[in-house]
Structures are given as structure tokens and as C-alpha cells.
């Protein structure tokens, strides 16, 4: 099994001849992620962990029937609703719930419930006024 971190939340898992991309996201201009969208488009199986844009913003590119990418996207209900607002055709979007098992050849992915951090006011203020965040607005 090979796991490759691709920046932000993006991870590529390779095992038993299968490749799965989790949370594809291309860094905003000026960011530290050296990847571009073309680095992701060869992947045909996408898993989105939750519906925030930094986890699914690039996913519509994989669902574009005019691109060569046309992947199958596994995601929860909220992410699926977000994607349905972003693209016309969601026939390749598969809704999953905690406890579901995604089977890809000999690879099994168990869908688990996750808890997203809920920052308080001080953490939000620190993030919004951090040098790393403000660089995007130069």
C-alpha cells in the first residue's frame, strides 16, 4: 500500500492495483501546494470526507462529461448536495454513510463517522489574520 499526501487534505491511496484520491484540492494562488489539477485528473475513484470546499472544490472537474476524467465520487449527503449545486450530472456520485463499505477490486474502504473541529472565536480570529491566510489577498 502506498499513501501520498498531495497537499491540504488531498491524499492518494494506491493498493492492489487500485488508486483512490481523497479530497482533491488545488492550493489557492500563492499557496505552498505544488500540485495542479492535471496531477489529479488521472484518478478515477474519488472519496470526499465532508462537504467543505477545501475538500471538494475540484471534484466537478472529475464529473465533467466532456473531460477525460469522469470519475466515480463517493461522499456523504451534504457533499452530494453541494455537488448537485455545482454540476448538472451527478450520476457518478455515490452517497455513502458511516458503516458502508466501498469495494474496489480487492480494496475495501470502511466509511466512518468523523467529527470536524469547531473552532471558537479566538481560533477564527487567529486564522483570519494569520500571515499565511492574508497572503491570498495581496
Question: Where are the language model's segments positioned?
Answer:
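Beta-strand-turn-beta hairpins that frame and shape the catalytic cleft
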Residues: 1-2, 14-20, 101-109
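Short active-site oxyanion
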Residues: 1-2, 45, 66-72
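Short gly/ser/thr-rich secondary-structure transition/capping motifs
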Residues: 2-5, 26-32, 91-94
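Short hydrophobic/aromatic beta-strand or adjacent loop that forms the aromatic wall/cage
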Residues: 8-10, 99
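Pre-active-site segment of Zn-dependent metallo-hydrolases
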Residues: 12-52, 57-65, 118-138
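Metal-dependent catalytic neighborhoods of phosphoester/phosphodiester hydrolases
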Residues: 57-68, 78-79, 84-88
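Metallo-beta-lactamase
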Residues: 76-138
